[in-house]
Amino acid sequence: KKFFFIAALIFSCIITNAQNVGSSPEYIKLLTPDWKGERFADGRPKVSDAILERLKNISIEEAWGVLRNKGFQNQFESDWEIINPGEAMTGRVVTAQYMPLRPDFEKQVKAQGKIENRAQQGGTNSWPIDILTPGDVYVADGYGKIADGTLIGDNLGNSIYAKSQRGVIFYGSVRDQQGLSKIAGFNGWILGA
């Protein structure tokens, strides 16, 4: 009896610790409680297009000054490689975080993705692209991985732009930057290119 109780307890802990691949609207709202405006169905704050357009006209220094004055001291990272440095990019973010690929972990992530009706063809790096809407910027943490860790090339870059009319901010690497730079309107801030 004791063995079955312990086995049942361990099994229930595994089940309760299972995580969704994507964040629920409730979790996103929990992380953004100060937002009082409209939200998307997925819970993200719906910053107006008018504000996004106004933000294109301010400098990095101005934005950084406002953030620091509001108590956001850790929101700046330098040394980005910008695909089109003369073009401003603003948008609402869709975030993703990647860890170095492990076959055992990938199997579990793909199984959970199947439960969440995510595409099973190709890699998981297409999943955030699938949910982009006009005005979104795809922000991904790839742990700065360069070798065997590119998140997109120009094919996925075209898909990102078709869905969002924006671009990407990646702490990681991309391939075919020349092809990405030829996508009219697309931009990317890459740290680890």
Protein language model features and the residues they cover:
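Short, surface-exposed secondary-structure edge patches
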Residues: 37, 128-129, 177
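Bacterial Sec-dependent N-terminal signal peptides
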Residues: 1-19
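Phosphate/pyrophosphate-binding betaalpha-module
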Residues: 169-174, 180-193
